[in-house]
Each structure stands twice: as structure tokens, then as C-alpha cells.
Regions:
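Conserved C-terminal helix/tail region of periplasmic/extracytoplasmic solute-binding proteins
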Residues: 304-340
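Solvent-exposed, polar/charged alpha-helical surfaces in well-ordered, non-transmembrane soluble domains
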Residues: 82, 86, 136, 153-157, ...
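N-terminal secretory signal peptides
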Residues: 1-9, 17-26
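Secondary-structure end/capping motifs
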Residues: 233-313
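N-terminal signal peptide c-region/cleavage motif recognized by signal peptidases
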Residues: 28-30
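Pocket-lining segment of extracytoplasmic ligand-binding domains
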Residues: 97, 178-267
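Short, glycine-/small- and polar/acidic-enriched structural segments
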Residues: 34-165, 170-173, 189-195, 210, ...
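Solvent-exposed, acidic/flexible segments
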Residues: 73, 77, 117, 148, ...
Length: 340
């Protein structure tokens, strides 16, 4: 966000309705010359979170690609967007929230698909011994969160629902790893966090769930792409192939989660049983979906909510950042089939 390592005062640039009269959101796929489909010399630089895409693609048997993949581990959406903006990544992923700040900064990034993910692992936790039973009890308390991420958004909405705002709490912006350490030391009374760190806080330290992100988040997690890569015909073809493989991998994981959990555990060191517990309590199955009007409207609604909550100081129009040139990846023959 400034990405979240910088102060809000540096996020003042508004996204103008014109990210350009001609945007990638309205262009079709680049056209390959006849016979120019050899991808053997293409390298896709893909951002992965620990235990996610890299582990998923390998475990599902989708790793034999006609192009080379160079995995780069970056563990929040802000870092993915910063790397794409700096032309250090071709693909990444994250939530709709980093994407809002990218829009406001006119970052060189596009959103080309959405992953549907579990929202019950997006949690607002209280320490087991803290006098906190509901969100309203957070007033005056030390509450950790990760700026410009889903935790920033759903915590803002939960506070507003309880008649509070960030001004009513002692909000502490921490990375997930630093937040877990702070929770362990007793430096936080509550923590808004996502993923396996929330599970670790519950299992290791007896943290209690006050609320989840279900009902506050859309469940859409965009796939981020480098517009320079989208414009290159060979890279566009490789990205389209990767999206097909990724969708098959997610569908495979829905029916083979134990195998996926083992692959995740190898990277994260989170016990397989803990990952299975998260899965068993999921709000939805995995899926990868094409961009449609509902996706764009949902993202704009998040932007408008952030503006109303005072997190953004001006309107952001997100539609110009959504690219629909990969729609054929979701209609390709056999795309919905899981690998054997």
C-alpha cells in the first residue's frame, strides 16, 4: 500500500476516471503470428504465498508447463503489487484491498481473474484472558491488523457496525509474523488477521474468535497481472495456460485436500491436522473465475465502503484496472476437468 509500509499521507493521489481512454480492460487478447506458439523460451515470474500456488500447482500435477515458472515468495498482496508495478513479476495475487490502493496510486497492474476463497480464516481474535467478548469491547484496546489488506477492511466494517472507528482503538499495524509475536508477548489485546497465523494464535495461545470475515468480505481475491506481460502475445498465451492449470488445481484440491494440506505443511510447517481443521470450517470451496460485471461491481462497492469509513480520502474507480482478455481460459475445452 503505500503500500502498507508508508503512511496514509502519501496515499493522496486519486485515481482519475482516465487511467487512459484506451485501457487493457477493453482490449482483446494480443494476436500471435501464425506458428508462433512455442512457449519454451517464456519465463513467467509468479508471486506465491508460502504454502499456496507453488505447493498447489506441484501437488495437483499441474507443474509440467510448456514455459518456465520462476516462483517468488511474497507473503502479502501489497508486495505482489509493488513487484508487478516495478516489473519484477508477471503474476501475483491478493485481496481486493491492496488493489484499491494500487488504483489510487495509478500502479501498473491489472486484475485478470478472481479466486473464490474461505472467509472463515479471516478473523478478529481476542486474547484468551482479555475482557473482550464482542467488537464493542475493543474500545481503547490494543488491536493489531495489517494495513491495506482484508484485515484493515473487515475490522473497519466491524468497528463501524459497533458504533466505533479506528480512532476509538489503539490500532497497531503489524506484519502477520510480527503480529503473532506481539500476540504471544501480550502486546496486543486483539488481532485482525487472516490465514494460518490466526489458526496458530488459537491453537498456541488460546485466542478466541470474535468475528470472521464472512459477511464483510466479498470472497473475491483477484489475480494480479503485469500489463506489460498482458500486451506480449507469448506471455499472454502462457498466462492463459497458467490460469487453466490453476483452476484445475483448485478443483483438484476441493476433492483431495489432505494431499494439498501435506504439500502446504512442507512449506509452512503448520501441522497437517491444523490445516485440515481450517478446511473443515471453510465458508466455501475453492474456485477460479473469470472477470464479469458482478466482480467489478463488488470491487467498486468495497472502494465505496472504504471511502464512507474514512479509510480513503477520495473516490477510486476500479473498473479500468479489470482486464477481460483471458475469458477464453475459462471456456477452453477440458478446463473444468480435474487431473487424475
Amino acid at each position: 500500500m503505500p503500500f502498507p509500509t508508508t503512511s496514509g499521507t502519501r496515499r493522496r493521489t486519486l485515481l482519475r476516471a482516465g487511467l487512459g481512454a484506451t485501457t487493457l480492460a477493453t482490449l482483446g487478447a494480443p494476436v500471435l503470428a501464425a506458428g508462433a506458439t512455442d512457449l519454451s523460451k517464456v519465463t513467467l515470474r509468479i508471486g506465491t504465498y508460502k504454502g499456496l500456488w507453488r505447493a498447489l500447482i506441484a501437488a495437483s500435477g499441474q507443474g509440467q508447463t510448456p514455459y518456465r515458472i520462476e516462483w517468488r515468495e511474497l507473503n502479502n498482496g501489497v508486495l505482489h503489487i509493488e513487484a508487478i508495478n516495478g516489473d519484477a513479476l508477471d503474476l501475483g495475487s491478493g485481496s481486493e484491498i491492496p488493489a484499491l490502493f494500487a488504483a489510487r496510486q495509478k500502479a501498473q497492474v491489472r486484475f485478470i481473474a478472481v479466486v473464490r476463497e474461505d472467509l472463515n480464516n479471516q478473523v478478529t481474535l481476542a486474547r484468551k484472558d482479555a475482557p473482550i467478548q464482542r467488537i464493542a469491547d475493543l474500545k481503547g484496546k490494543r488491536v493489531g491488523y495489517v494495513r491495506a489488506t482484508t484485515s484493515h477492511y473487515y475490522l473497519s466494517r466491524q468497528l463501524a457496525e459497533a458504533g466505533l472507528s479506528f480512532a476509538d482503538i489503539n490500532a497497531v499495524n503489524l506484519t502477520p509474523a510480527d503480529g503473532l509475536s506481539a500476540f504471544d508477548r501480550g502486546d496486543l489485546d486483539a488481532w485482525a488477521i487472516y490465514g494460518y497465523n490466526g489458526q496458530l494464535a488459537r491453537l498456541r495461545y488460546g485466542a478466541r474468535v470474535l468475528k470472521t470475515g464472512d459477511g464483510y468480505l466479498s470472497g473475491n481475491f483477484p489475480v494480479y497481472a503485469n500489463p506489460r506481460s498482458i500486451q506480449d502475445p507469448l506471455r499472454h498465451t502462457a498466462i492463459s495456460d497458467y490460469l487453466q492449470r490453476l483452476r484445475r488445481a483448485y478443483l483438484w484440491a476441493n476433492g483431495n485436500y489432505l494431499a494439498y494440506a501435506r504439500a502446504q505443511s512442507e512449506e509452512t510447517r503448520v501441522p497437517v491436522g491444523d490445516l485440515i481443521e481450517l478446511w473443515n470450517n471453510r465458508s466455501t470451496d475453492y474456485d477460479l473465475r473469470a472477470v464479469d460485471e458482478g466482480v467489478v461491481r463488488g470491487h467498486q462497492a468495497v472502494a465505496d465502503s472504504f471511502l464512507q469509513l474514512g479509510v480513503l480520502d477520495g473516490p477510486a474507480q476500479v473498473a479500468p484496472l479489470w482486464d477481460r482478455s483471458f475469458g477464453s481460459a475459462f471456456t477452453a475445452k477440458g478446463n473444468a476437468q480435474s487431473p487424475a
